[in-house]
Regions:
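A ligand-binding cleft/hinge motif common to bilobed small-molecule-binding domains
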Residues: 92-107, 170-205
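N-terminal hydrophobic or amphipathic helices and topogenic motifs
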Residues: 1-88, 106-109, 113-115, 127-132, ...
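Flexible hinge/capping segments at coil-to-helix
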Residues: 122-139
Length: 301
């Protein structure tokens, strides 16, 4: 009996320490993101002013037709602080004011939301294990994507540069190219609608989605503090909900279809492969289980 008591007491102490640490962390995190006097005064002075934010209207999960994750961020910001916001439709590739910007280089300033990557898509179901499998193939893309892959990969493919997304999509439809090189999030709607096959991921070719701050330093500080809280509490739910809704729309799924998808308990079997799975004690890991974890979040939105 004494032995059991000796075991229980340390466990209780550990639990209390963890709980105390969590409370301290959350309290410190919350306090560090509370508005200071200057920020509160700025809000009071600008109650009748309108803050313009530049947002795209064609960026799938993040911003389409006034909906999406970045729209929800600014809607919640407006509701939290009573700031009137005007959403101005803008090109996400060239935006330099307060709003959403997408760039090939990781921003030194700004508030990072999401990191996208390039993929190769095809009309045919083909297995590509490594870049050398692309030798002799025709790969189409826009200037930025082709510049990346032609310099970063030692492959003897034919690269075809297109001036627009429309022309690139038509080239794939006409079989003028074997593969189209595209950023995954930007093209996920077309991939779903056309039933294109993602044949290869290029995770090192990235695009960064971030909130570009404006010229008003106090407003920037308000946005930054709200972002810290919102990203921690709301971002993941917003992202997966919007992604799920996009899949439902583009795949024309019915209510019955979605009920079948979300009501199941999925049992996944696997064989150990160090490249894709890992097993330590009773815990699983690796690339495969990372995908499965994301899928679980996706269907349980």
């Amino acid at each position: 009996m004494k032995k059991n008591k000796k075991i229980v007491v340390p466990i209780i102490i550990i639990i209390l320490l963890i709980a105390t640490g969590a409370v301290i962390y959350l309290t410190t995190f919350k306090n560090s993101n509370q508005l200071n006097i200057k920020e509160k005064e700025w809000i009071d002075k600008n109650k009748t002013s309108i803050v313009t934010v530049n947002l795209p209207n064609d960026l799938n999960v993040f911003s389409t037709d006034g909906k999406g994750t970045i729209n929800e961020f600014f809607d919640e910001l407006s509701k939290e602080y009573g700031i009137s916001i005007n959403k101005n439709v803008s090109d996400y590739k060239t935006n330099t004011s307060l709003g959403l910007t997408v760039s090939e280089s990781k921003p030194e300033e700004g508030l990072l939301l999401f990191t996208d990557h390039y993929v190769l898509i095809s009309k045919n179901r083909e297995l590509i294990n490594e870049p050398s499998d692309l030798n002799g193939k025709k790969i189409g893309g826009l200037n930025e994507g082709i510049a990346y892959i032609s310099k970063g990969y030692k492959i003897t493919s034919t690269f075809v540069t297109y001036e627009s997304d429309t022309a690139l999509a038509q080239g794939l439809e006409d079989k003028a190219i074997d593969y189209a090189l595209v950023p995954l999030n930007e093209y996920i709607d077309k991939i779903l609608e056309k039933n294109y096959i993602i044949t290869y991921h290029l995770p090192e070719l990235k695009k960064y989605y971030y909130i570009h701050l404006g010229t008003d330093e106090i407003l920037n500080s308000i946005v930054n503090k709200f972002y810290n809280i919102w990203y921690n509490d709301e971002y993941e739910k917003s992202y997966y909900t919007n992604l799920y809704n996009l899949f439902v729309e583009k795949l024309a799924l019915t209510g019955l279809d979605t009920d079948k998808l979300t009501s199941k308990t999925y049992k996944i079997g696997f064989t150990e492969n160090p490249a894709y799975t890992s097993l330590s004690g009773n815990k699983t890991g690796g690339i495969l289980f990372s995908y499965l974890t994301d899928f679980s979040k996706f269907v349980n939105t």
